[in-house]
């Protein structure tokens, strides 16, 4: 059984941040960002493997996911998430070796930070969502892109669903369970959904969490449109039913066999091995 993580809080100007941490206190830092609808516990299988290699893995709960607070500024845009990731580098004791690792919304944030020339992180790893610009077609890839885009709307219905005020938060946990089943077919998410119920205990938290999608229509999306300028590893499950694997391959992602969207939980050894190889 993997060792239990250390749990503690740090403070940002807009909210408190709950953090789970694995590994040696003096190890180089990996800040690991979870996605939607998920929690920092999503790293419980990969983090111990990175910790065994000497890394200190700190996994914050994102805005609106308890024990982190609901931000006083109400911000849930990519720009706000990038600001949090940059601030956490210093708050968590990062240095010039620090790595930013993200899944889903954590990957969107990681990709945006990798597009910032002033990123405080030396390397960046994104799981299950490549940079948005990297998924644009070229004349050479137009056919593959078109085939993937025909299928993608079948997976992306939830984005429009989350735009409707009051709808997604009314029965958030039923929506979450459906998405886990759809995105990672065959994976047993019982433990993950239990963690999610603790992290999203009421309608106010649910409203904050789905507001990430509502903020996509505002100016705060801009950082996510930047091309990466720092070293960036992309990993994507071959059975992902959230974002078409074909789009990820066009972006240069390495395919992880036997995994859906929650690749870090379904194939932790493969993910950890790829990350450690990239970091070496």
Regions found by a protein language model. Give the residues of each.
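Conserved HGGG/HGGXW glycine-rich cap/lid loop of the alpha/beta-hydrolase fold
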Residues: 20-69
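Residues that form or immediately flank small-molecule/cofactor binding pockets and catalytic motifs
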Residues: 24, 239, 258
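Short hydrophobic "strand-cap" motifs at the C-terminus of beta-strands
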Residues: 33, 235, 256-259
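Flexible "cap/lid" subdomain of the alpha/beta-hydrolase fold that forms the substrate-access gate
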Residues: 2-6, 14-17, 41-42, 58, ...
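Alpha/beta-hydrolase fold catalytic core
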Residues: 1-29, 52-55, 280
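Catalytic histidine-centered segment of alpha/beta-hydrolase-like enzymes
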Residues: 259-268, 272
């Amino acid at each position: 059984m993997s060792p239990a993580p250390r749990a503690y809080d740090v403070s940002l100007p807009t909210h408190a941040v709950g953090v789970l941490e694995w590994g040696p206190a003096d190890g180089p830092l990996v800040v690991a960002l979870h996605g939607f609808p998920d929690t920092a516990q999503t790293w419980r299988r990969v983090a111990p493997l990175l910790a065994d290699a000497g890394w200190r893995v700190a996994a914050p709960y994102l805005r609106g996911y308890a024990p982190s607070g609901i931000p006083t500024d109400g911000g849930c845009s990519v720009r706000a998430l990038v600001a949090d990731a940059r601030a956490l580098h210093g708050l968590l004791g990062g240095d010039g070796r620090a790595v930013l690792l993200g899944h889903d919304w954590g990957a969107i944030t990681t990709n945006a930070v990798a597009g910032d020339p002033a990123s405080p992180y030396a390397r960046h790893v994104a799981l299950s969502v490549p940079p948005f610009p990297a998924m644009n077609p070229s004349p050479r890839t137009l056919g593959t892109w078109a085939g993937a885009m025909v299928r993608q709307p079948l997976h992306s219905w939830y984005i429009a669903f989350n735009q409707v005020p009051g709808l997604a938060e009314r029965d958030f946990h039923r929506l979450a369970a459906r998405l886990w089943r759809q995105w990672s077919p065959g994976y047993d998410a019982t433990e993950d959904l239990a963690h999610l119920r603790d992290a999203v205990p009421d309608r106010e938290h649910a409203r904050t969490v789905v507001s990430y999608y509502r903020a996509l229509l505002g100016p705060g999306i801009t950082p996510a449109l930047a091309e990466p300028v720092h070293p960036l590893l992309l990993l994507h499950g071959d059975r992902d039913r959230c974002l078409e694997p074909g789009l990820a391959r066009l972006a240069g992602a390495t395919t992880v066999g036997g995994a859906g969207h929650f690749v870090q939980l379904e194939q932790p050894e493969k993910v950890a091995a790829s990350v450690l190889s990239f970091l070496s």
